[in-house]
Amino acid sequence: MGAWEVVKKTAEMNVIRSTWAFKIKRYPDGLIKKFKARFCARGDMQIEGVDFFETYAPVVQWTTVRLMLILEVLLDLKSKQGDVTAAFLHSDLEEGENVYVEMPTGFRKEGHVLSLKKTLYGLRQSPRAFWKYLVKKMESVGLHQSEFDPCLFIGETVIAVAFVDDILFWSVDEKDIHEKALALRNQGVLLEEEEDAAGFLGVDIQKNEDGLTELKQEGLINRIVEALGLQDSAVKYTPAEGTPLVRDTDGEPFPQTFNYASVIGMLLYLAGHSRPDIAYAVNMAARYMFSPRSIHEKAVKRIGRYLKATRSRGIVLRPSENVLKIDAYPDADFAGMWGHEENTDPSSVKSRTGFVINVADCPVLWVSKLQNGCTAQSTMEAEIIALNHCCRELFPLMDMVTSLSTAVGLPQPMTTMRVCVHEDNAGALVLANTLPPQYTPRSKFYAIKTIWMREEFVKRKDILTVMKIDTVEQLGDIFTKGLPKATFEYLRNKLMGW
């Protein structure tokens, strides 16, 4: 592939070391797919402005993937997946980037180094260079980059998403996907023969006999249970206690029974892709990743025991008939740590934002996060902050749904968008629905920041409403606090479909 040429080493060269990287690639169920060995450059030895400049490279949002999977179920689309072999070796180094690498062990020639022509694995600029290469090739075969997601590509008959070198295709006719994949190969892209989309980035896409789709990560859950040593342990039926998880600085030290950071990393990936029901519990445990205590070990193991009891389940995509039906459920827990954490700890007075946005009654985006940007001074203020955060995600999502529905050619009965924001706080409802805003001395200082939100409500008033919801029906509640078993299972059923 002309990745390099051997040149004589000179004194002015910044020669970076090389290394071998060995990786096990797994199927979504955890079984080994193949062993990989890559000759890599030591990117940590590069010097910015000398042998690399820009490094940013986007990847597809999982919100986009879930939206496409909902459309697949609704419209009976065909889907295929492909993988670009030796992806980074497709793209050239940009002009002015002179990168020199040691020759690999066993092939060294005294006084000589490798002058790279292609973006070798390990270089800081490699992901960006390949992304730019892929965009160019996609455009050349009629797949145009979306303005709402830089890794979503829309054509006349095919839609594709890309996460580095992993690509998912959708079309009404499977033949169109094969033709588009062939066109990419003819452009020099080494795209492996596409297969049925049974999994993507470690998430199993299981299509049931009744036409429903379930996103699950049983293989990852098994690895978490094994890492925690819970194979023979009893199970739990909720992922978190009813009381918040505190810092416990003076408590018993962490007993080092497992790698806390590693397990938290796996749990975060799981919570962000197929298990929103554990998002609150995982976010709380992740706060103490760098200074865990014994109490945090027990909290993480509780999550593991809950996952053990529900390991075979994930998000069930059971879409309603209208993909343009969007529901947002923002919620907040005002100063939820107060009285549980030490009063001298600034985080004890922080509130928590939690929300989920459903498209066609299926969850596509969710958040459980501490309100670190500011400290709410009342329940209404905490709710407004949560509503504001939710709307920052909702409005672009509405535009993306409109774009995708146009691209796939929705039938006429499905072309009317209806968006509803479900709010359970009366004060937040009044502030959200009032324009021009009726400021009070207590609300002015933070309400000004949200005027854009109310202006958007006015612009979209024909399709968007903000309405009252009973607290017991508020889906956002599952993202803000630990709930009793009955309440948790009721909301989980509404959220996850089981």
State each model region's role.
Residues 1-136, 140-147, 227-229, 256, ...:
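Chromodomain-type histone methyl-lysine reader module
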Residues 10, 22-26, 154-156, 207, ...:
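Short, low-complexity Ser/Thr-rich regulatory SLiMs
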Residues 11, 25-27, 44-46, 85-87, ...:
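Conserved beta-strand elements of beta-rich interaction domains across eukaryotes
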Residues 25, 88-103, 121-125, 155-189, ...:
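Catalytic palm subdomain of template-directed nucleic-acid polymerases
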Residues 29-31, 48-50, 89-92, 99, ...:
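Short helix/loop capping segments that flank catalytic or ligand/cofactor-binding pockets
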Residues 56, 65, 158-159, 212, ...:
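Divalent metal-binding acidic/histidine catalytic loops
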Residues 81-88, 115-123, 147-171, 196-206, ...:
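Catalytic palm active-site di-aspartate
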Residues 141-148, 168-221, 225-228, 304, ...:
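Polymerase palm active-site segment centered on the conserved acidic dipeptide of motif C
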